[in-house]
Amino acid sequence: MADCITIAPELSFKDQITELAAHLSRSLPNADNQVAVKEFVQGYEAQVDTEEGRGDVEDAKKKQVVKSIVDKFVELKGGLEAAKESEVESSHFLLQHVLSTTFDQASEEYAQAVKDVNEAVKKGAQETTKITRAEAASRVLKNTYNFLPSNSPIRPSTLLSLMSLLASTLDLSALPLPTSTLLPALSSWSIPSSEKVSFLTTASGLYQSTGNLAKALELLTLALKESVEPTVVERAVLLALAVPNKFELDDVLAVQGVKEQLGKVQGVVELFEGDEVEAIEKGKKWTAENVSLIEGAGIPGFTSETVLRKLRLIALVALCTKSETRQLEYAPIAKALAIEESEVETWVIDAVRSKLIVARISQPQSLIRIHSISSITASSRRFGPSEWQLLEKRLEQWKKSVNEARQVVEEAETVAQQGLGQQRRGGKRREEKKEKEDKEEQE
């Protein structure tokens, strides 16, 4: 079977079917019964025998036999049992060759046959207790995807079968799906935009189920670029809120047409666009009124506290941005964030770990000293009249500091020059004194 890819075109149709039947026999419930296995294989041989062994099998008969083989693959859950690992892949390569040469590849019956086999392989992998069988199944689905033409409308469903298998049985992260690879694939698949959206939303759900919320959001954003559907918009906004270290909604809101389809999430979006400190109390009200929306999203780790955490951290960044002295005492932070003073340090540490600010905590003085502020929040990038005024004040302070530093340097240079002059004059007097003493000694 290892050489079936090379020799498949050279095999007769009967031999191809016999090879497939022999492979399937290993997955039979009574596979250890040699008589039953032999009868199983001979049954398929009999179906493709021509009169006196001469001539080709008629096309209609071929299709009937191949459909029977496909049904058996489905019944035996992909036929993943084999004498050696490579046999599973080789047999499925042969099966794909038989399907593509028996049916018109543009026909619905061909597409359905491939999908049925893919689903059977996935199901067999998910139900097996042997990791090697699951790994073999994943390779089969990868090979099937690569066997299909790049524009094949069956590729999306094949890829989803593979992703579903990996997500439930192995490791979805083992299948990198970078945008640079996905976008060309999407554009080449011969499917309508609605099916592309369906693929992307389903794939997003698989990543969400494994806890990779950032990737799930990335795929939903791509889906929105295909078609702005209210349900997808709502899902994308909630996912953006759920991603732990994402503090803005720009990627989603930047898609044309999204802002007009916000629906139920309009209120929470507005919290990220208004006054940062006021947003905390408004956020408490919104989360209390939308518990069913938050819980119904079914996003791992996404709760009302997830939303309030982000609002508080954004408010903290806003306070840091507006501080003229680049330092903040605990009391005003606690008041603005609606927390106890004893909790301030915890929130500052969270902001630092989230790379929103770089700051140092002074416990004796109960204040934080701000070294730098990130631009990854919408509030830190917002620049209005108050920000211009603050910038003007800071520029004046910096200008004053620079002038003072320059004055200190100039004074130091003057002192240094004066000291050098005095040293030179002192040296000359010492030389004159020495000459005088030498002269007196000679006399």
From Swiss-Prot:
PROSITE patterns: PCI. It comes from the Eukaryota. One of its GO terms (biological process) is cytoplasmic translational initiation. Residues 205-375 form the PCI domain. Residues 413-443 are annotated as: Disordered. One of its GO terms (cellular component) is eukaryotic 48S preinitiation complex. Component of the eukaryotic translation initiation factor 3 (eIF-3) complex. Belongs to the eIF-3 subunit M family. This is Eukaryotic translation initiation factor 3 subunit M. The lineage of its organism: Eukaryota, Fungi, Dikarya, Basidiomycota, Agaricomycotina.
